[in-house]
């Protein structure tokens, strides 16, 4: 029996939302192919995955599927449900998935010491081992190095059910997906191919729609002008008719010819007003907003208020060694960072990059308010705290931060009204708050994790110009 997933006119709103997050979404997800779910942070990508897996029920519409469904979450804080069963299973399927995704047999008891990249591979291996008919993956490429992404791509290409994937990695989506569902709240549009192909098609359609709207606007202006001319002519004629009507008929007008002429003129006047009204109606229809045309918001942030620390070094630590657990040690030399240095920390998953950053951060030589630090992962409790702190800001600083959030591609009103901002939105809040304070030191651990595709390009451009 064929496995599939079908959305029919599906709408969804969280309690308290003034408008639905998703509205009238109709889409078909076939077996044997992957569908990319593409949209800005907060557009409803995770919500759609949860609807697909049955973790949420639609407010309106129906979702039809055959078989089982599995949703693999974004976060890797805790082991996934069924972790012990998976690691204690020795059948061919479990062994194959652990081998394919490089899951070590010793990982069963040391989740807390695994890197986030290792946790992500383990999470996906378990999901594939379940062999669900519908598999929904939320940011599976987060934390993975190039080797890990290649391994993941190979593993997902062996999956034969109906797959849905949310990812900020454009190249990964292009290589894996046969179609992409683009979310522009509350609407959704399915396009064939990967995200690059779909975006190009969307660009062409938007260009055509704007050209059509501009042409219609020109026609509307001409019709409105013609309507005004008709009305003015009708008003002038009506005034003349009124004056004639007020005159007495000639004494010799025994057959009523004069009165019939006046009545005829009145009829023409009425027709002139009718024509004017019809032209105005046509003009209004042509000038009406086109719902298919999206509003383009200005994107991009700049560290305009950033400065340079007035000291020789913003970090100066002696050589040291860090315990990575499981008998592993990371030895580092003396480390110094000057105010203008740009440093990339590279290495495979599990080698201690994040551990080193956590060791160095308490030793930086800049005031706390001048440090912009975005960690690799932010817990749900910490996310809620950050969101509540944001809403408590006074109007002026809140306006500054939300302007920057808007320029990172999220809608401020929707974000402030949300009770559960997405991980990507939380990272945007941290980035915007840091930019607004004018940082002297910027530390980012996997900065593109959880960010939507347009937002990734904004920090790249800003960091290239940052003075610190």
Language-model features, listed with the residues they occupy:
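Extended, highly charged alpha-helical segments
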Residues: 60, 84-97, 182-297
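ABC ATP-binding cassette signature C-motif
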Residues: 1-209, 303-468
